[in-house]
Amino acid sequence: MTKVCPEIEGTLSLSVVPVSVDVSFASDHFPTYKLGPDNQIVEEPKEDEKGPSVKETVEKESELLSDQHKRLSVRDLASKFDKNLAAAVSLANEAKLREVASLEGHVMLKKLRDALEYMRGRTDGQNKQDVETAISMVEALAVKLTQNEGELIQEKFEVKKLGNFLKQTSEDAKKLVNQEKSFSCAEIETARAVVLRLGEAFEEQERISEASRAQGPDVEKLVEEVQEARQIKRMHHPTKVMGMQHELHGLRNRIQEKYMNSVKLHKEIAIIKRVEESKSCPFVLEGKQSLGSCLRIRVNAQDNAPDLSNCSIQWYRAACETSRREAISGAIQSMYAPEPFDVGRILQADILSNGQKFTVTTDDPVDPDSGLPSRVESLMRKSNSEFSVVISQMNGQDYASRSHVFTVGKTRIKLSRGWITKARELYSTSMQLCGVRGNIKAPTKAVFWQPRKSLTFILTFESEHERNAAIALARKYAFDCSVTLLGPDD
């Protein structure tokens, strides 16, 4: 029986690829790896790893920078940016060193893989499997190294970006520092100028106060003299003023007396003149010359007296005897009842008889009714004022009627009886209202009213006072509506 023993080589002669002496490693020993699922090589964590990674450091610094940005002053911010810029430069240098180490790792892994490939071709059996396993681990290390290089490139890009940002921010901070410095210098100069001006003003004030203290006695003397002069003026001035006031009062009294004497003389002359004329005038004017009364023309001569009914009569009103007269349209009868428009005026009547003209005149202007203004004021407090009237004529024809209500409003006049309205018109230029001027009973209580063209009324009031109040009130309301409410041709 033959026993076969396999030949086992005691030593394998391998050609080792030389490694460059310039290669630098991150550590002094080979890292520890283990196989994970699907034959993936997983690097075991290093227990002696010192400090965080570059990415964590950059993130931490960025967070601190963003948190403290609002709280730092401009100068502190610039100093912080300078420190961070230096840290970013050091991190960039460290990344460059790691990039060089990564490149050397690739070279070393390439050489190691080539050596393992060479050994795989020279071995068989279990050793060959171990070599193939080692080759797989080397390839996995190469992939891991490539991934680390990608992360390193990304970190390098972020570090470079952060460095540029910090550099630009540092320059901006320096500009802000310089700008604030210039502003501060300008404010300091302004404050210094203000302080100088205040100092000059205080010095000027002090000089003025010293000068005033030096001139104190003279000023006190002047003040005493002024006070004495004022006292003398107060003692003598009122007496002089009172004397002048007494003189003016005496002059006014004398002028008033002379005026009254002149008016009295004019009246006496007018009376004498009218008496002389009345001796030759067969007519005379009688009646109270005031509002609410009635003036009548009477025949004065007894022998050869003309018949008044055969005479032509026309009444006039004038401001005075010598002024221009205004004919009263429709006043052609022997009697005439003055209305509020005649107050303060002289009334005259021309009488034409047998070709001769005679004139009768009131002695004085027509006197007003003392209670009329207060009555009108009380009525104006109401929105409408109502008066009881009787229609004597309508459109020139006699009209027998019962009592009606004559309503004078702020914008219109209405004549009604109960629910029946005879006339209702707004104030207009076609409306007329005045005392009656024709031959009618009780002319002192009657008015002529034309609401519109082709419609006229003769209305009789309960009293002379009511008649005059209605006329005055209606004219005031019409004047407020920019309408002049008078009689025909007034």
Swiss-Prot record:
GO biological process: actin filament organization; circadian rhythm; regulation of stomatal movement
InterPro entries: SCAB, SCAB-ABD, SCAB-Ig, SCAB-PH, SCAB_CC
Cellular compartments annotated: Cytoplasm, Cytoskeleton
Single Gene Ontology MF annotation: actin binding
Keywords of this entry: Actin-binding, Cytoplasm, Cytoskeleton
Gene3D superfamilies per the UniProt record, alphabetical: 2.30.29.140, 2.60.40.2700, ATP synthase delta/epsilon subunit, C-terminal domain (1.20.5.440)
Tissue-wise expression: Expressed in roots, stems, leaves, siliques and flowers.
Short name of one Pfam family: SCAB-ABD
Chief location: cytoplasm
Gene Ontology cellular component annotations, sorted alphabetically: cytoplasm; cytoskeleton
Family indicated by similarity: Belongs to the SCAB family.
Function text: Probable plant-specific actin binding protein that bundles and stabilizes microfilaments (MFs).
Name of the protein: Stomatal closure-related actin-binding protein 3
Species assigned in the record: Arabidopsis thaliana (Mouse-ear cress)
